[in-house]
Amino acid sequence: MSVTYDDSVGVEVSSDSFWEVGNYKRTVKRIDDGHRLCGDLMNCLHERARIEKAYAQQLTEWARRWRQLVEKGPQYGTVEKAWMAVMSEAERVSELHLEVKASLMNEDFEKIKNWQKEAFHKQMMGGFKETKEAEDGFRKAQKPWAKKLKEVDAAKKAHHTACKEEKLAVSREANSKADPSLNPEQLKKLQDKIEKCKQDVLKTKDKYEKALKELDQTTPQYMENMEQVFEQCQQFEEKRLRFFREVLLEVQKHLDLSNVASYKGIYRELEQSIKAADAVEDLRWFRANHGPGMAMNWPQFEDEEWSADLNRTLSRREKKKAADGVTLTGINQTGDQSGQNKPSSNLSVPSNPAQSTQLQSSYNPFEDEDDTGSSVSEKEDIKAKNVSSYEKTQNYPADWSDDESNNPFSSTDANGDSNPFDEDTTSGTEVRVRALYDYEGQEHDELSFKAGDELTKIEDEDEQGWCKGRLDSGQVGLYPANYVEAIQ
C-alpha cells in the first residue's frame, strides 16, 4: 500500500483500492475462506441433523409415555381413540424427522464434503494449491508495476525534499537581509544556496515526472494481468457460490415436510380420527358396560345350599389349568329330570402319582351322555371334591343316613382316610409356607398374597391342587398349592 504526503495537511492518506500493492490478498484469502465456509456449512447441517434426531426421540418418548397414561387412565370410547391418534401422529412425524436427519447427513453433508475435497487440494507444506496459484499469479502480475511505483515514490520523496530545502533557503535569505550584522559574503552564500535548491527542485521534478510516465506506461499491462488472475479467482468462487446455492435448495427440500405426501396424510388421518369421536356413542357404551344397561344376576330361589358350594368349586376348578390330569365334563343333575341333559362344563383334576390305576367308568355323570345313560364305577383312591347332583338325587333305603358306615359313597383308601367328599377334613398339622408368586383371589373364599409373603397351611393339598391356609391377619381361605413352598 503506497503512502502520499500532503505538505499542506501533513498527514498520511492511504488507499484501499484493489490496485494498490498487496491489496490482492483479500481475493486470495477468499479462496481459504471458501474452504472454511464448506466446513461451516457441514457443521451447520450436522447440528440441524442432531436437532432433528433429538426432536424425533422426544416425540417418540412423549407418545410412548402418554399412550400408556391414556390406556391406564379413565378415558374411554371414541374420544380415547381420538386422543391416541395424537400419539400416533407424533410417532409418524418422528419417523419423518429421522428421515430428514438421514437426508441431511447422508446426502447434503456428504455432498459438501466430497465437493470440498475435489475443489481444494492441500499441499505438503500447508495451505491449498489453489491459494498458492492465485498468490503467485497476482504477485507476478504486480511485480513490474510495483517496481516502477517504488521508483515513483522515491522520486516523489526526493522532489518534495528539494522543494522544502528551497523554501527554507528563501526564508533564511529574507531573514538575513533584515540583519545588519550579516556581512555580504554570508549573504552571497545564502543566495547561492537558493540557486542550488532551485536546480535540485527542477532536477527532482524531471526525475519524478519521468518515473510517473514510465509507471503510466506499465499500468495498462499491469491492470490486464491483474484482471486476468482476478477473473480466475472469480470463476473459482462462482463455482463455490453456485454449489452452495444448489446444496441449500436440496436442504430446503429435505426440511420442507409440507411437500411430503405422507406428512399431509398424517394430519388428514388425525383430523378424521378426531372428528370420528362421538360423545353420544361413548355415553351409550358407558351405560351398557358400567351403568344401568349392565346385566344383573338377580337373586333367585335356590333349592339346596350345597349347590352353591358345588358351583363355587367347579368355577375354581375351571380356572385351574393343569399340565396333566383327568378332565371331567358334562356334569348332569339327575333325579326327577334324569332324562334331561344339562349344559356341560369342564373340570380339570390333577392326576395323583400315588394312584396306580385310572378312572374307569361304565356310567359317569361327568361325561356328556345320550338319553340311554350307563352305570358308574370309581377307583377307590379317586377323591372327588364335590358330589354330583346325580348321587344327591338317588333313592336310598329308609335307614340311610350320613353315617359313614351306611354311606354307599364312603370309601377308605390304603391309609385309612375318611370320606373323600367331606370338605371339613383337616390334615391335622399346621405348616408355615412362603409365597413363590403373586396370587389374587378370584372368589370370596380364596386368599390373596404377594410373592415373599408368609402364611400358615392348615390343610394339605386336595385332588384339585388347592390348600387351605390362614394369613397372618387371621383370614382363612384357599390358595393354589404350587404357589407356595414350605419354610425350612
Swiss-Prot record:
Residues 163-176 have a biased composition (Basic and acidic residues). The modification Phosphoserine is found at residues 273, 315, 375, 401, 448. Residues 11-282 form the F-BAR domain. GO terms for molecular function: cytoskeletal protein binding; identical protein binding; lipid binding; phosphatidic acid binding; phospholipid binding. It comes from the Eukaryota. Keywords: Acetylation, Cell junction, Cell membrane, Cell projection, Coiled coil, Cytoplasm, Cytoplasmic vesicle, Cytoskeleton, Endocytosis, Endosome, Lipid-binding, Membrane, Phosphoprotein, SH3 domain. A motif (NPF2) lies at residues 407-409. The F-BAR domain forms a coiled coil and mediates membrane-binding and membrane tubulation. In the autoinhibited conformation, interaction with the SH3 domain inhibits membrane tubulation mediated by the F-BAR domain. Belongs to the PACSIN family. Homodimer. May form heterooligomers with other PACSINs. Interacts (via NPF motifs) with EHD1 (via EH domain). Interacts with EHD3. Interacts (via the SH3 domain) with MICALL1. Interacts with RAC1. Interacts (via SH3 domain) with DNM1, SYN1, SYNJ1 and WASL. Interacts with CAV1. Interacts with TRPV4. Forms a complex with EHD4 and MICALL1; the complex controls CDH5 trafficking and coordinates angiogenesis. This is Protein kinase C and casein kinase substrate in neurons 2 protein. The gene is Pacsin2.
